[in-house]
Amino acid sequence: MEPSVVPSWQELFGELVVLDLASPYVYLGRLVERQGDFLLLSDADAHDLRDTQTTREKYVLASRGHGINPNRRWAWVSLREVVGVSRLDDVIGD
């Protein structure tokens, strides 16, 4: 698979994104802005993977296929916890 044009991370503002955290949480939502040491998401799904039997990858793939189910109007996520950021549309399934 050949990569398409690689965006700069600032181009992710306004996009639906996946934030993988060091903890067993994954956040999905629209990346609005950076506020100091936090990323602000709107219409966010804050998902604690300890609450389900599914894996992080399966949960994100399901969200890509069926859409995000927001449980937060706004979510401020600490950059210290974020280990990865990607557009939801860039998630690759089997």
Give the residues covered by each predicted segment.
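Conserved RNA-binding domains used in RNP assembly and mRNA/RNA metabolism
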Residues: M1-D94
